Amino acid sequence: MSTHAETRAITAADIRAAKNTRRLAMLTAYDYPTASIADEGGMDMLLVGDSLAMVVLGHEDTLSVTLDEMIHHCRAVTRGASRALVVGDLPFMTYEQGPDQAMHSAARLFREGGVRAVKLEGGKEVAPQVEALVKAGIPVMGHIGLTPQRVAALGGFKVQGRSAAAARSLAEDARILEDAGCFALVLEAIPAPVAAHITRTSGIPTIGIGAGAQCDGQVLVVHDMLGLFDRFTPKFVKRYAELRGHAVKAVQQYGDEVRQGEFPAAQHSFGMPEDEQRRWEENVSGADD
């Protein structure tokens, strides 16, 4: 059970200031009830990730989700989170063309979605976008390593940075993104020693997902850690509950009780005052005659 008692809304500046002071906990959220649960559970940050394409909308990858869909879900999450910092993903092809496109997309996530930070994928190639957004007052979280929006170019969902050259490239990307103004950096599916090095040498918090225990914080997809998504489970996921199985059993029990006439019972139904019911029955009886 979380003992985190802070009630003030967390800001991107708070997250950056947490470097070397405390570990950060982050989960994805895509709707009001999940956001409310995660917020009450003491999460520092909630990510409205483009992973909603897979775990909520049923797509095979994250590439299909649109900016309008992201805004729709961001609205729901921001209504459910009173304390945690809500970060919205910029989806595929809404920022890659340059700073102007990134500014337009991020502004919509802020104004229409209500988020207080955005996340974008990529290394040195997106530094100009990061710089422009930060200059405009929009906090940016970076994301390197396995970047799902580039899964086609990466040849699938594979661990990144396993060669010395690739590891050096990741470390360089981390430095460039920090210099561009990112307040935090997601490290996804990279070797633990590489993530540890980036964490030690970076002045901003690193948030790991499949990047070992030495990161400044961790993030998981909420459907994975609660056992709600059964299509596949990444190696780096720990399941803290198996809610899908419980939910299926509950639905089956409901169906059985409906078909057997056991639901609704008297306590689930509404009655009438006795005198009004008597008048009603007399009226019905008279109409039948």
Swiss-Prot record:
Localization of this protein: Cytoplasm
Pfam families: Pantoate_transf
Residues annotated to bind Mg(2+): 50, 89, 121
Cofactor note: Binds 1 Mg(2+) ion per subunit.
Binding site for 3-methyl-2-oxobutanoate: 50-51, 89, 119
GO biological process: pantothenate biosynthetic process
Subunit description: Homodecamer; pentamer of dimers.
Record function comment: Catalyzes the reversible reaction in which hydroxymethyl group from 5,10-methylenetetrahydrofolate is transferred onto alpha-ketoisovalerate to form ketopantoate.
Protein name, UniProt field: 3-methyl-2-oxobutanoate hydroxymethyltransferase
Biological source species: Oleidesulfovibrio alaskensis (strain ATCC BAA-1058 / DSM 17464 / G20) (Desulfovibrio alaskensis)
